[in-house]
From Swiss-Prot:
GO terms for molecular function: ribosomal large subunit binding. The keyword Protein biosynthesis applies. HAMAP family: RRF. GO terms for cellular component: cytoplasm. Pfam families: RRF (PF01765). PANTHER family: MITOCHONDRIAL RIBOSOME RECYCLING FACTOR PSEUDO 1, RIBOSOME RECYCLING FACTOR. Responsible for the release of ribosomes from messenger RNA at the termination of protein biosynthesis. May increase the efficiency of translation by recycling ribosomes from one round of translation to another. This is Ribosome-recycling factor. The keyword Ribosomal protein does not apply. InterPro entries: Ribosome_recyc_fac (IPR002661), Ribosome_recyc_fac_dom (IPR023584), RRF_sf (IPR036191).
Amino acid sequence: MINDILNEADGKMDKSVEATREEFAAIRAGRVNPSMFNKIVVDYYGSPTPLQQLASFTAPEARIILIAPYDQGAMHNILKAIRDSDLGVNPADDGKVIRCVFPELTEERRKEYIKISRHKAEEGRVAVRNLRRTAKQHLERLEKDGEVGQDDLTGAEKRLDGLTKKHTDAIDEMLKHKEAELLEV
């Protein structure tokens, strides 16, 4: 029982760390990355569709992304979705591809991205701590119901604290790398 609870908590914490990693990938550092477009949803013939499903992406230069829609009829809606997003870019199309030229990162913008990164990291740490609290409640319920003893509960809580520390440390490490990446000129 204890191992099941701890394994479930570990798996969910891994997912929280991975979600934080994906959030960091969407924050632009020096080079543009197609994952910056992950959260953009396009109105495609009346249904909201992720941009990744509607186009292919290439990055020929550090500050340029070319987006080639699979369906040219979706070009206008893709342009609108990119303009409405918070990427801070004005896309241009030549009829076949959409060109997004990102401006150089100013020091002010870098600091803003660092602030956003720290916020995303804190959200990830909070998610991990919430999972710890839930798992701890399940463990305490086992002890209350008499299924495990106090010693087993104490040992399980120490293992749970170790898992929590491992996952929050992973998020902190990702944050440190992201900040270094953002400060790199």
